[in-house]
């Protein structure tokens, strides 16, 4: 219901970037304006990843496995995301809430404490014992992204990096999740365990070549 990076000022502050987003706004408005004879809550998932995921974040893991991923400079980008196991935990907590505090509330589903794209990538690299991830200046990645745009236009092939994908990687935000924390409590999966479970599934499916090893979670 809001474009990537836009932080809403309220539950009804919408900024949909496309027709798909507009359709979700319409769905929320229908729920809010209805006279439902039951309790209801609205959940807004962020970027969900984990076993059985497809395309974008699966490619993220595969690029690190093949040592083709590069950090974007030294800046840390906060990308609200959620491991699917944590997402299910949050939904069930909201769904089975008996306190009434969740009634007519809106919840963002994002892991906490948050992790940057850089930390996420380094956790994947360590779990796979892959080669150390290199850091590239932004101008180099801009050139690669532009080349990807040309390849996509001419060859109808979707390369790993395009200008729009690079922009998306640099866009994040701190979504309001205090009410999510309040009702869901501690999440069951830390990033280290979540990455291992995801990589283990990918290894069994032959999506990656490095056999994952679980690393000890940070305190």
Where are these regions (language model features)?
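Catalytic helix-loop patch of NAD(P)-dependent Rossmann-fold dehydrogenases
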Residues: 2-49, 53, 65, 69-73
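Substrate-positioning beta->alpha
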Residues: 26-27, 53-59, 73-96, 104-108
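Conserved catalytic core of Hanks-type protein kinase domains
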Residues: 34, 63, 94, 143
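Glycine-rich Rossmann NAD(P)(H)-binding loop
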Residues: 50, 72-77, 105-114, 125-127, ...
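Mid/C-terminal beta-alpha module of Rossmann-like enzyme folds, strongest
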Residues: 97-160, 189-192, 196-219
């Amino acid at each position: 219901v809001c474009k990537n990076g836009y932080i809403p000022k309220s539950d009804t502050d919408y900024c949909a970037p496309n027709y798909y987003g507009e359709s979700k706004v319409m769905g929320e408005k229908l729920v809010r304006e209805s006279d439902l004879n039951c309790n209801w809550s609205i959940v807004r998932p962020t970027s969900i990843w984990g076993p059985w995921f497809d395309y974008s974040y699966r490619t993220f893991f595969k690029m690190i496995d093949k040592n083709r991923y590069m950090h974007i400079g030294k800046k840390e980008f906060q990308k609200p995301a959620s491991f699917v196991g944590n997402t299910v935990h949050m939904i069930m907590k909201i769904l089975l809430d008996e306190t009434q505090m969740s009634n007519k509330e809106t919840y963002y589903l994002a892991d906490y404490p948050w992790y940057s794209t850089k930390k996420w990538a380094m956790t994947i690299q360590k779990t796979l014992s892959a080669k150390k991830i290199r850091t590239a200046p932004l101008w180099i990645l801009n050139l690669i992204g532009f080349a990807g745009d040309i390849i996509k236009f001419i060859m109808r092939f979707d390369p790993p990096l395009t200008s729009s994908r690079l922009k998306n990687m640099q866009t994040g935000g701190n979504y309001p999740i205090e009410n999510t924390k309040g009702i869901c409590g501690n999440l069951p999966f830390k990033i280290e365990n979540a990455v291992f479970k995801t990589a283990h599934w990918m290894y069994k499916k032959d999506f990656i070549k490095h056999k994952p090893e679980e690393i000890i979670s940070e305190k």
